[in-house]
Amino acid sequence: MEVAAKLSGARLSAQKARLVADQIRGKGVEDALDILAFSTKKGAQIIKKVLESAIANAEHNEGADVDELKVKTIFVDEGVSLKRIKPRAKGRADRITKRTCHITVKVADK
């Protein structure tokens, strides 16, 4: 049994989210939640909410036991980039790219 949860358009770059995702891939959900709870990265709190959603989906929809779940797959894809302009000196402007990402977490029985 495999259950997924997805967050689209998270205001976080995919590169920074992948640093956190790599830490919990393949771990049990209890260990993964502990790692995310004590991480200082912004992406850790976002990924933690997605993981908690996947766990809740497994409990509610499939009747799974939380102690038996592990993070089977987690991947981060790039989302749309928001283009913004930052005014500079002498009438010039620089482009700022505010990146987003899509986070997918799949949990399964051990």
Swiss-Prot record:
> Any idea which UniProt keywords this protein has?
Ribonucleoprotein, Ribosomal protein, RNA-binding, rRNA-binding
Report the domain of life of the source organism: Bacteria
GO biological processes? translation
Instruction: Tell me the PROSITE patterns matching this sequence.
Output: RIBOSOMAL_L22
Question: Which Pfam families does the record associate with it?
Answer: Ribosomal_L22
Q: GO cellular component terms?
A: cytosolic large ribosomal subunit
**How is the quaternary structure described?**
Part of the 50S ribosomal subunit.
What family is this protein classified in? Belongs to the universal ribosomal protein uL22 family.
Q: What is this protein called?
A: Large ribosomal subunit protein uL22
What is the scientific name of the source organism? Cellvibrio japonicus (strain Ueda107) (Pseudomonas fluorescens subsp. cellulosa)
Q: What does the organism's lineage look like at the top?
A: Bacteria, Pseudomonadati, Pseudomonadota, Gammaproteobacteria, Cellvibrionales
Gene, per the UniProt record: rplV
